[in-house]
Amino acid sequence: MKFNLHIDQAKFPKWIYAGFDNYADKFRYPYELVLVEKSLLYKNLIKYSNLAKPFSQPMGHYYIGLDSPSKELDSEQLSNHLHLLSQEFSELHFFIGSAYGHPNNVKSYFDERLSLSSLTFGHQIMIPIMAEVIYRSYTLMIGHPYHK
């Protein structure tokens, strides 16, 4: 299972990368966490979202937009949800919006939208936060004694 964290920017402060790497380095095969900066996939969703012919997503891929307000899950619920998705999909793509969120026409391409909180977070800080959230779900899925 590959977890892809997409963001339409690059060149973040070193502590952002350090926070992400702290969790990404802990994943073990067959699980993997990847940061996709200046995401071409996200740019294409924006680019083709106004076309009459819908953008075709690859088989085995599932798109999750991080967007507020949306469905909120606690850690165990998210872990169970991701475990179920891993039975059907080989790659999960999490999309972090810009400072203004996701364009409305792009939201229709997401298979679902999730919110981490009713609080608003800066899009850069979402990188290490999502790395921790996905890592926590991963550890619960594999029965690792990480905090619940």
Regions found by a protein language model. Give the residues of each.
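N-terminal beta1-alpha1 ligand-phosphate binding loop
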Residues: 1-27
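Short histidine/acidic/glycine/proline-rich micro-motifs that form metal-
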Residues: 9-13, 40-41, 69, 120
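Short glycine-/acidic-enriched loop or helix-start segments at secondary-structure transitions
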Residues: 15, 74-76, 103-106
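Short, aromatic/basic amphipathic alpha-helical patches
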Residues: 16-25, 48-52, 106-108
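S-adenosyl-L-methionine/SAH cofactor-binding core of RNA-modifying enzymes
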Residues: 28-93
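Rossmann-fold NAD(P)-binding glycine/threonine-rich loop
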Residues: 97
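Structured adenosyl-cofactor binding patch, chiefly the S-adenosyl-L-methionine
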Residues: 105-148
